[in-house]
From Swiss-Prot:
Uracil binds at residues 194, 199-201. It holds the Pfam family UPRTase. This is Uracil phosphoribosyltransferase. GO terms for biological process: UMP salvage; uracil salvage. Catalyzes the conversion of uracil and 5-phospho-alpha-D-ribose 1-diphosphate (PRPP) to UMP and diphosphate.
Length: 209
């Protein structure tokens, strides 16, 4: 069973409070989501494999450590997931970036896939699937289905806010996936929004309604 981890670092929690506030404007929301994503990436990447490398410092030769093999692929679920990409790239600038496009039917709350574009070597990379919200879990499940179908196996799901319903659904469908979130909230409301949540992350990131 993959692990479920709430990242409770004080800076993450402080910044999460900023973006939860309904008075947080688009510019601030976007900037702080970027900052939270960088902080979360530090913990999510903790188990990346290392290998020895012989180098020479100004003083002496030594055996140092470097990342081993293929590195990370970041795969945002469009459109809100885009807001988390740059923050992770600041920490892992060599990462490749794929995209999976989803939209949610407002009546059924079911996700529909409309676009998939991934690095050709996705099966050799550690994949961070990013989406600010894990609500019903439908989009996350479908995105991970698409990744596994194309050969990915080392997958982590990273979100800012999650609902118990979404966590349960994702763990039941993909029990091998590690889930990282900045907060586990109370529940979903009748419209499929996380309560207390932070509203529609995509609209708040891009200034749309």
């Amino acid at each position: 069973m993959g692990k479920f981890q709430v990242l409770d670092h004080p800076l993450i929690q402080h910044k999460l409070t900023i973006i939860r506030n309904k008075d947080c404007g688009t510019r601030s929301f976007r900037e702080v989501v970027n900052e939270i994503s960088t902080l979360m990436a530090y913990e999510v990447s903790r188990d990346m494999p290392l290998q020895d490398k012989t180098i020479e410092t100004p003083v002496a030769k030594m055996t140092a450590k470097e990342l081993a093999g293929k590195k990370v692929a970041i795969v945002p679920i469009l459109r809100a997931g885009i807001g988390m990409v740059d923050g992770i790239l600041e920490l892992i600038p060599a990462a490749k970036v794929g995209h999976i496009g989803m939209y949610r039917d407002e009546e059924t709350l079911q996700p529909h896939e409309y676009f998939v574009k991934l690095p050709s070597d996705i099966g050799q990379r550690q994949v961070f699937v990013v989406d600010p919200m894990l609500a019903t879990g439908g989009s996350a499940i479908m995105a991970i289905d698409a990744l596994k179908k194309r050969g990915a196996s080392n997958i982590k799901f990273v979100c800012l806010v999650s609902a118990p319903e979404g966590v349960k659904a994702l763990r039941e469908k993909h029990p091998d996936i590690d889930i990282y979130t900045a907060a586990l909230d109370d529940r979903l409301n009748e419209d499929g929004y996380i309560v207390p949540g932070l509203g529609d992350a995509g609209d708040r990131l891009f200034g749309t309604k």
